[in-house]
Amino acid sequence: MPFEVKQEKQYPKSSNAVYDAALKAVAGLGGKLLRQNPDSGEFEATFDKKILGQVLGDRTQMSAKITASSEESSTIAVEIYPLDAIGRKLMFGARKGVSETVVTWFFAHLEHHLGK
């Protein structure tokens, strides 16, 4: 069973608006940006075991890419997976549902910041 989650969503907003809202969503969840490139619409972030006061059990890392579908529409594709104690991708022994929970919360925060 793969522990990584890949999800893609489309929004009727410009790619810059989605990128800014995504960074706010990461900050709202207590994530740490590892890398960001506004020109290409990409960023990577890590999240601790504890998010919004809830202990999930595993650290996670997310990479996202925002692309413009049209002038007023864009798509965000995210990949999220659990990390071990020293920051490597966890290939086995991860707790079930952690990645799904983080991606669900991320999209909820993203949509809140987009004003959906």
What do these predicted regions represent?
Residues 1-116:
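Ser/Thr-rich, low-complexity intrinsically disordered terminal regions
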